[in-house]
Amino acid sequence: MTAYKAPLQDMRFILHDVLDSTAHFARLGRDDLTAEIVDAVLEEGAKFNEGVLAPLNRSGDEEGITFKDGEVTTPEGFADAYRQFCENGWASMTGGEDFGGQGFPVSMAAPFQEMMMSANLSFRVYTGLTDGAVFALNMHGTDELKTTYLPKMISGEWTGTMCLTEPHAGTDLALLRTKAEPQADGSYAISGTKIFISGGEQDMSENIIRLRIPRQCRED
C-alpha cells in the first residue's frame, strides 16, 4: 500500500516565501497567525491525514458503503475518523467565531483540505459539502436560520449537503424543475425530485442538513 506523506516543505515554501502568509493574515485581521502557528497547524494536519485518513483510503474503496433498510453505513473506521476530525477542531477551522468556529481564513484551511483530498478523497467529500452548506447559510440565511444551524454544523455535530441533481439534469442548474412556491406565512412549499446527492446520507453525524436548490415561483 502506498503511504501518503504530506508535502509540508512545499506548503511552507508557498505560504511563507511566495505568498507572505504572515502579512496576508494580518491584513485579514488575524495577526495572531504567525509563521510558527501556521507551521504547527500544518504539522498537526499532516499527522491526522497521514495517520488517520490515509490508512482508510484503500479499505474504504474496497469495502464501500452499505445501504440496508433505508440506512447508509460508511466503511469501517470512517465514523471514528470523523469523530477525531471534529474533536481535534478541524471541522471548525473556518467557521465564524460568533457560532463557535475558529475564524481561520480559507487560505489557512486550504493546505489542510489539500492534504485531505490527497489522503482520502472519499472522506473529504463529506466534509467539503458541509463547508459549502455553511457558506451558503452564512451568506444568505436569516439570523434565525444561522443561530439554529450554524453552531452544530461548524462543530461537526451536524453535516450538510447540497441537493442540485435531478433525474433530467446534472449540474446544469438552468434545467432545474424543482419549484419553491411562496406561502402566506413566509415559508415555501417545495416540490420536485432530487437524486444522486453526494453525502446525502451517512452514519457519521447526528443530523444532515440538506439544502435544496429549487426554482422560485414568482407571485403574480
Locations of regions flagged by a protein language model:
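Amphipathic, small/basic residue-rich leader segments at the start of a protein or domain
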Residues: M1-R124, T148
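Flexible loop/turn segments at secondary-structure boundaries
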Residues: F99-G103, G132-A136, E144-L145, H168-D172, ...
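Short glycine/proline-enriched turns and hinge-like loops at secondary-structure junctions
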Residues: F104-V106, D172-A174, E201-N207
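Short, conserved phosphate-binding/catalytic loop or strand-edge motifs used
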Residues: A109-A110, G128-V134
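Internal maturation/activation junctions in enzymes
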Residues: Y126-T130, G141-Q183
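A short core secondary-structure module
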Residues: S187, S191-D220
